[in-house]
Amino acid sequence: MEKAKFKVVIVGGSITGLTLAHCLHQANIDHIVLERRHEIAPQEGASIGLWPNGGQILDQLGLYGELEKLTEPLNVMHVVYPDGFSYSNTLFRQIRERFGYPVFFMDRQKLLDVLYKTYPNKSKILVNKLVTELRQSDGAACVMTDDGSTYEGNLIVGADGVHSRLRSEIWRLADINQPGLVTAEEKQSMTVEYSCIFGISSPLPGLASGEHVNAYMNGLTVLTFHGKGGRVYWFVIQKLDRKFTYPNVPRFSLDDAERSCTALAKIRIWRDICIGHLWQAREVASMTALEENIFTTWHYQRAILLGDSIHKMTPNIGQGANSGIEDAALLASLINHLVNIQAIKQPSDLTVNRMLENFEAIRYPRMEKIYRRSKFGVRMHTRDDLFKRILGRYVIPLTKDRLAVMASQLIVDGAVLDFLPQPKRRSGPGWPKPGNCRDGQNGHKRIQYILMSIVLVAPAWVYIFSSLVW
């Protein structure tokens, strides 16, 4: 008699969750997706940037061509400072030359729509399924939903975002079975220091397709990305007056967004374009608190967290969605190895736990690096202290030709699906060559030289600047 199939229950029809569904389908691993909302791809004004590390995985899944039709590759970045100084560089063009994939921005809704419409078995993606409880026992796990349904699997995956119910359930079970495993410090480790008004606007004269503007200001930064047909994806990120601890964080309405944009309306971001123009041309917009954290408890028994449910960043370096896509690819690869290569269809609790420990051991160091870069990025863009003001205004412009090298370090060691062929377009000198890490090492050394120069020179600049001001 044939053994029961290994089954994965995915909580959350997010980009991470749907990517995992595609990956598992390619590996012929049984699964089901439970989404709490009544539709998979609502238009909420959110946008995402797809970088080569995420793009190569979607290319492996055969989805990249559909996404390219909807987008315009970014080529040029303009950086603007409060004193009127600005410079431009070809960071994005260099990224494309190094990796074979462009960087592009698109509606989050459109990416979700492509992920859903191209998925071959819609009966495995269920909506109106709010997970209320996680249960685990020897050899199995299940979740219950608010309509009374129960879904059992060998593995439960939380891809349900920053407000993850599965994360809360993991903590609840851990507190019962292993008190102290999830510490009080970890439960209070996610914080909010910034708010973000984000939106999508109709084309504006002066904001050309394929370009990006990053306006550094004191306590404020504005990011615009100009997509296909001139459509503008934008973020207005502001420093709050104090740090908040999740879940006791501010909640914002559309009225709050309007009041903020009205107050900031005359602030110029690029040439004659002001924040008010973005708001007036909006098609959709929203406002939210920006949570930041990388949790330390990634899995418990037969449940694991992916994407924003376990590592949450601000949008400044554009790696949030890409990181979730990588999570999905690595987990699918490990499951495939367990079920299809080792032929363990019904693994023990110990075997599943070892697989999840392996996942965390691989992903945590990379995500910690990306998280640190993101945390520093938003604080430099908002000129959070004197050091970052000098660094952003006087040092970074001198190293603009090296920005692609620095950005490459967040791309080059990204996870891929190890059971599917590498895409043909995954080419260029940026990727590591088999048996040869020289390019990556050289890039890392160049970054070290740049950072060492900053460390040595910046204190003198701080002293001189302080003397002039005070």
Swiss-Prot record:
**The protein, known as:** FAD-dependent monooxygenase nvfK
Glycan attachment points? N121
Where is it found, in Gene Ontology cellular component terms?
Answer: membrane
Q: What happens when the gene is disrupted?
A: Completely abolishes the production of novofumigatonin and asnovolin A, but accumulates farnesyl-DMOA.
Q: Which Gene3D superfamilies match?
A: FAD/NAD(P)-binding domain
Q: Where in the cell is it found?
A: Membrane
Q: Which organism is it from?
A: Aspergillus novofumigatus (strain IBT 16806)
| Involved pathway(s) | Secondary metabolite biosynthesis; terpenoid biosynthesis
Ranges annotated as spanning the membrane: 450-470
